[in-house]
Each structure stands twice: as structure tokens, then as C-alpha cells.
Amino acid sequence: VRLCETDGAVTADNEGLTLRHGSEATIYFVNATSYNGPRNHPVTAGAPYLENAADDAWHTANTNYEQVRSAHVSDYQQYYNRVKLNLGGKLPTVTTDSLLRSQVPQLPPADGKTADGKPLPTPRGNAYLETLYFQYGRYLLISSSRTPGIPANLQGLWTPHLWSPWRSNYTMNINLEENYWPDFTTNLAEMAQPLDAFIQALAENGKHTVHHFYGIDRGWCACHNSDLWAMTNPVGENRESPMWCCWNMGGAWLVNTLWERYLFTRDRNYLRQIALPLME
């Protein structure tokens, strides 16, 4: 943690940083972990997280807020600005949360009618809100899928919990796949690269799963849930029902994203060197 760009007095001790008589300050928080890929033990073969964090913190020494913000906006907009959508919606005069409340109807009665027996009115569409949702989905993917080998998970980057629901894992019986539905269709092919690397890690572990669970000596499989370590075996919490726990088509569904990349790019080298070996 570094505190700088302040008009107050800063002191530091074992308890932390203290700012006195200041009206403003810029605080840089730098974090790192020992995660070093799914095949490496984070303790015995982990990344040098202290050195990495210290190096990142050192690079903030001669950087002010405006420079950091400018670099962020430039990096983000090179992807975001590729696609524009105009459905003819007008800029609203209310905040987004107020706009949402005005557009989302209350749950209707079971018969779909009002108290006087009349059909419930159909809510009108809002072209601005639909455009906003479209670009919001692209924003989420750009922000969540930039780390090599680590695709966007169930909660993205914004979970407020130390232990997130479903551990912020990868649910591969639709959630992980739908995270990446906007990638090629909205010109964000780079965001799929972490998913490609993750599928390759799944394929390595999936060879053991398909052999030990199903007695098959070729190919690979992945079940419904995975994590940072690219696990592929059947898992679950509490009641591990076979209805979902033993579903083993996660790998088959995920490799469809590899084929989609080829359909969009027609990159035969990618098809030959990466996609087909994982699909066969």
C-alpha cells in the first residue's frame, strides 16, 4: 500500500498508514499471489508474490492519478470502441437504477391478470436500456478476462465475499460458456485467449478423469464444475446428486468455443495447432 499525492501529513507504523490534516490523497493498493499455473504447487513452486507486488508498487512511485487513469482508459477503449450499437434510444433524464425500476414490472399474479380481471399491460421496451445492457456485457468481459490462463469466473472481479458463492469457480454446464458468448460476436476475440489456455489445462487433467472414472484410454472429459486448478472430476457440495454431479460433457461444450474462433477468424494455423488436438 502506498499513500501519496496528499496535502496532509502521512505517518506509518506497524498498524498501518495515518493521514492527518489532509483533504485528499491517492492510495495505491498492490496485491499478488503465489499462483503459478494449474500444474504448479503454490507453495513449493509458486510465483514470487512478494517480489512481484513490490515491483508493481515501485512502478507507482513516479505516477500520478491522472496518468494511471489515462493509461487505463486507453487500454480499455482499444477494445470497447470497436463496436457501437444505436437502437434509437434517447439519453434518459433519470439515473440508471431509477430507469431500471421503471422498466421492470412487478411479478404478475398466477393468472397474469390485474385485480379487476384485465390482462396485465406489456411493459414497453427501452432502446437506451437495451443498448446499455449490450455494452455492459462487453464491459464485464473486457474487465474479467485479461489474465493469461484464468478466464472469467462466476462472480468476475466484483464479489464482496471472502468465500464467494460457489467459490467463484467455473460452472461448465452453461455459466462459463455463456460468459464468452459476446467475445467473437462483439469483436472481443482477445478476451477468449484465457479460456483457450484454460481448456488446454482441462484437457491435461481430463485425460486422467476419463481413464480412472470411465476406463477410457484416449481423449479427455470435464464434468460440470472446475476451478483455478482446472479440475475435471465429478464434484459437489453436500448432496452430490448424480443428476448434475456426474454430468461429464463440460469439455465437449467448451471446445465449441475453439471452433467458433476458427469460424470467425479462418485461422488454419490455430485450427491445426490448438483447436483440433483438443477436439479430437
Q: Where do the model's predicted regions map?
A:
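Residue-level recognition of tetratricopeptide repeat
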Residues: 138, 260-263
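Extracellular structured ligand-interaction cores
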Residues: 22-26, 136, 176-177, 244, ...
